Amino acid sequence: MTTLETLKWDGKKSGKVSLDLAVAKKTSSADLIHRAVLRQLANKRQGTASTLTRSEVRGGGRKPYKQKGTGRARQGSIRTPLRPGGGIIFGPKPRSYNLDMNRKERRLALRTALMSRVSDIKAVEDFGSTLKQPKTSDIINGLARLGIQKTEKVLVILDSPSDIIKKSINNIEKVKLIAADQLNVFDILNANKLVIGQSAIDKIQEVYAS
């Protein structure tokens, strides 16, 4: 179990909250997280790259020049892979890059990744509570009050973010908003800082406890 210090939106300390998630053993955690990240990135690939083989390229019915007497190497088709505009040997074809990983391992990898970032977590009691309308500058100033630099990549995790917060964060390049029940290993590891709403911590423990 880990105890996190909670902050208010104005940056002042407000109390403490516990985060208790089961993690993988040290001997296997690195491999588990690595496989989870590979799976996530592989599954994002569209797999639509496609090239034409010799049989698919248009043309090539006639012999480009006679067999003998030119002094050049013999050629039987203008669509041979040896010529510009010819077919591609062993080029990419549409395929699925999806990798499998069972649900139990995925959950364990996510919990392990999150608990490994405990020192970078900012638990906020009332994230964006003063926002009455979408305003990017208010979010930027609020993150600064939490001790986060403008150059840092930030992952904001909230239980049920309002449209006002979504629109306010949407225009900030290095800040990403994600719902507490839609966490993923890559975003957790890719961010420099994690800002988690107090209600989101409860949601995380409810959803990912097992």
Curated annotation (Swiss-Prot):
GO molecular function, a single term: structural constituent of ribosome
Pfam entry (one): Ribosomal_L4
Top-level division of the source organism's lineage: Bacteria
Ranges of Polar residues composition bias in the record: 44-54
Region annotated Disordered, chain positions: 44-85
InterPro entries according to UniProt: Ribosomal_uL4, Ribosomal_uL4-like, Ribosomal_uL4_dom_sf
Protein biosynthesis in keyword set: no
Gene3D superfamilies: 3.40.1370.10
Biased composition (Basic residues): 60-71
Keyword field: Ribonucleoprotein, Ribosomal protein, RNA-binding, rRNA-binding
UniProt keyword annotation of Aminoacyl-tRNA synthetase present: no
NCBIfam families: rplD_bact
Assembly mode: Part of the 50S ribosomal subunit.
HAMAP family named among the record's database cross-references: Ribosomal_uL4_B
Family: Belongs to the universal ribosomal protein uL4 family.
Protein name, entry field: Large ribosomal subunit protein uL4
Species: Prochlorococcus marinus (strain MIT 9301)
Classification of source organism: Bacteria, Bacillati, Cyanobacteriota, Cyanophyceae, Synechococcales
Gene name tied to this protein: rplD
